[in-house]
Amino acid sequence: MNRSRKVKPLKAIIIVLFVLFVVNETSLFKNDKTHTFDEAFAKQMQGDALHTKSKGNQFVNASKQDIKAAMTVDHKDSDLMYMDLSEPIEMSEDEVNDMLKGNGILEGHGKAFLEAQKENDVNVIYLVSHAQLETGEGRSALAKGLRKGDARYYNFFGIGAFDRKAVKTGASYAQKAGWTSPDKAIKGGASFVRTQYFENGQLNLYQMRWNPQSPATNQYASDIDWPAKIAARMEVYYQKYGIKKDDIRKDFYKK
């Protein structure tokens, strides 16, 4: 049986304020629909955004049909692709460390992931799942850290790691950010997601990848299946720990 483990306020919300909030939120969602789906798709095709898909052990350019299919909001998709990730959830350090077992350099850093969630209001299961995907379960070159001078720099979220020179550019970003330890890379990555995406209104995986409000700009990944891959990992943990999925949104486009 699923139970809600969202961090809740200490005082109950007055019903009138709650109703006003719902009305305001509904209006906000309506106002942020800037394009029809077809208009957004056209912008993705016309812009400079890179769209790839995995084929074997490499990434190749995605076809127009593949891109449109990945962009399409499907009821068969995991709800976690469309869930608000800006809300912390209650997890113990032991539970987070359990998720990180066998994950190379990520293993044992449950406390840092929980602190990153608390400091930045970023869902900890998302953070773990994203880091696992980007680092190949903590075993990529960027995850192990690249030495420059007397320091070693870590990057667990692929930040600044541009596809063709991912290791070089990702390490350069980590150096500029001062991520000289795994904990700094975890917290720095969470802060980046908060400031660059959540504060831009991109609160779920779909929005982070496709940015419906401003298509072909500020998109986290080039992989068209990036949201589905992270959602699949999150799904395993949500089921394992019996956590309720809250705040799902699937309407992004004008009719």
For each feature predicted by the language model, list its residue ranges.
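His-Asp-centered metal-binding catalytic motifs of divalent-metal-dependent phosphohydrolases/nucleases
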Residues: A131-G136
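Outer-envelope exported proteins of Gram-negative bacteria
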Residues: L127-S129
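Catalytic cores of secreted/periplasmic lytic hydrolases that degrade extracellular macromolecules
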Residues: N2-I125, E137-K255
